[in-house]
Regions:
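Short alpha-helix
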Residues: 68-93
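Active-site rim elements
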Residues: 66-70, 130-132
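A short glycine-rich, Lys/Arg-flanked "PGG" loop and its adjoining helix->strand segment in the class I
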Residues: 15-30
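A C-terminal cap/extension of S-adenosyl-L-methionine-dependent methyltransferases
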Residues: 92, 96-150
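Conserved class I S-adenosyl-L-methionine
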Residues: 30-59
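Short catalytic micro-motifs in class I SAM-dependent methyltransferases
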Residues: 6-7
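A conserved beta-strand element that flanks and buttresses the S-adenosyl-L-methionine
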Residues: 3
């Protein structure tokens, strides 16, 4: 498997890295990419009550992210087209960190020492991450594909 989680959005042009990822996978191997969701750019500023920024985010793909550095976002469709053109067939995509991403904004914290709470949270996140419309609102998405025969 070839994994690239949280890197693509820091590159101005994703194509060179996507080329390398797809080329590195063996026939039948998995390519796994996580990146920012261009269709949900308004979520974070809206949750932070930065209404002007949220309104502007509907028409942008760039932001200063949580790490304080510029980043860009992709759509599931565009990234699927990129990997498909390089011999990797997209299998599924998931929304990532949908509800846990919002906890801090609501004043609620997840207690990592409460194993029952962690298990329940993970179950809800997994279910939301694979269902529409929930996964479409995730600020990050996870695309999983399989490389075709050589």
């Amino acid at each position: 498997a070839v994994l690239c989680h949280g890197v693509l959005g820091y590159l101005e042009q994703p194509e060179p890295l996507v080329n390398q990822l797809c080329r590195s996978a063996e026939a039948g191997g998995i390519v796994s990419i996580m990146t920012a969701n261009a269709n949900a750019m308004a979520v974070r500023p809206a949750l932070e009550r930065r209404w002007d920024d949220a309104l502007a985010s509907f028409d942008t793909r760039t932001e200063i992210g949580v790490l304080g550095v510029p980043g860009r976002a992709d759509t599931v469709e565009e990234l699927s087209d990129l990997v498909r053109a390089r011999g990797v067939e997209p299998l599924r995509w998931y929304g990532v960190w949908l509800f846990v991403d919002w906890l801090g904004f609501s004043g609620v914290e997840l207690d990592p020492s409460d194993s029952q709470q962690v298990v329940a949270t993970a179950a809800v996140e997994l279910e939301a991450g694979r269902r529409d419309p929930y996964r479409q609102l995730s600020r990050v998405f996870h695309l999983v594909g399989r490389k075709g025969p050589s």
